[in-house]
């Protein structure tokens, strides 16, 4: 006759039976968490890739290259050599508007224009500054959104001759594209002046190099070659123009470099910062860059190697206003040297 198990043996048997069940549940939970993480990471990288593809395939500028036999901005000849457009580039136009917000009666002017060219293979970024006073052709936009005539004047006015923020931005894109012999432009980001303070404070300030001729004396102590701008001082630093726009363009370059460096450090500490800024800046900006493309740009920006490109020209005065006329020969060299590959 088999002996019945004691109460102690029953408890031990019950405990041993429960352990594998608990372990099995734990394994299932951990597996589900792992699957979720893999799916999340995969979705992120898929989103990044979609963003890259969308940017590369998008085209805002409608201007075609003068003299091209093909509809594509592709192969050209220069000084007896053959060049092909670098298809690894994504060109984005950054437009700074001299108005405090986008909900206004005054449309404003394009006070700052920078073509940001991203080489997606080399992770190099070239920023071409375009003076607000550059003389060029730009469209006059009617109330129906169509361009009904062309005006010759300062490129900053291209923004003023749109009926709303989108039309004004696209008018600037087409003016810049036309100036650069039909350069393809994949997107734009238009930022209003009152966004500067919030941007600067969000990255903990921006360090710039200064001298007594470079900035308002109230910000220059004479004891240092650099200055850390907070939101308030940054606003004044980039806005002041004086008698000429040329010194301000140089300050803009210093500010952009300093901001990018601060942003890289801040993003390394908080990977959600680009998304927070994107949401915050909606009140102060207009863009045709969608969320997937923005995610792609944010993830790539940390590794960017940045270089500024200058366009030579001649300053002058016309009807009391400063003008800047580009040197056509230098402009062609800039375009060939930075946007094309010899073949």
Over which residues does each language-model region extend?
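Non-catalytic, solvent-exposed segments at the cell envelope interface
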Residues: 2-9, 13, 20, 30-31, ...
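Hydrophobic core
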Residues: 36-38
